[in-house]
Amino acid sequence: MVSPMEAGNPAMAAHKDFRFNSRVVPPSPRRPHGQSEADCVSRMKRLACAVLMLCSLSACGGGPRLPPTPKLPYSAWYIGLAAPKHMEVWVETVDVLDKRGLAFYRVHGGVASYTGKTEGWHGGGSGGKPINHVDLPGQIFLRWQSLVEPQAYKINIQIPQWVRDEMVRPERVICKFKQRWKTDYRDIIALGMAPGGIVKVWVGGGCLGFTEIGRFQAEVEPRGPYRGASKGKYVPLEPENKAYIDQHGIPYGSW
């Protein structure tokens, strides 16, 4: 059986370790006395069809079901990852619990985009990875490695209703990139990560400005990077960023 959370994310079910159960094959049944070989074959075919029908009904009733495609004014919304310049991070996972209560695991991760300055934040960001087949976010779980410290952090961020309202509200705007009017949506959630476990979250759109959702304090992941799977080893820090930290240190308190 697949749990409701796994049903919301077929990729998670694929991580299960499926194995065939070995069994002893029984000997073929003897043909009853007085019954022709053709009668036996016909009877066995009917029995096989009945078994297949039962198996099909069982699979339909108990197998994983894909959630319906959410009704949004766009094909997908986006998650962007950001960090201050030289404050290198590695995102282990971004998980989403959408407003339907369906969980989607590892929808994003890896490297982040870096702002133009080390201290303070930029105005949000643009771009990101499309989050397909997922409804508007109710919660976002983030776990990452702050490589300049180094330290592993995790946080569960509650997304307020006003953010979801903004994400589906159309707005006419002159897009500065194309210099023409268009109807745009705030379909991007940007996650900014800084040393000390600081997280800033914005909502915005490609042709619209970004609005801050909030500033949050993450907690240290007690098991370390990769929840202990790497035995305390972090992703290596880029030499350029290491040289900057060695010379200037980490400007805690500026984010």
Task: Please place each PLM-identified region on the residue numbering.
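C-terminal motif of bacterial Sec signal peptides marking the signal peptidase cleavage site
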Residues: 56-59
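Short, surface-exposed binding/anchoring microloops in extracellular/periplasmic proteins
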Residues: 68-96
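Tryptophan-paired
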Residues: 97-148
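Bacterial signal peptide processing site
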Residues: 61-63
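Bacterial N-terminal signal peptides that target proteins for export
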Residues: 37-48
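Edge beta-strands of extracellular beta-sandwich domains
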Residues: 152-157
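Short, low-complexity, Pro/Ser/Thr/Gly-rich segments in the mature regions of secreted, periplasmic
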Residues: 238-255
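Compositionally biased low-complexity segments at domain edges in trafficked proteins
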Residues: 167-236
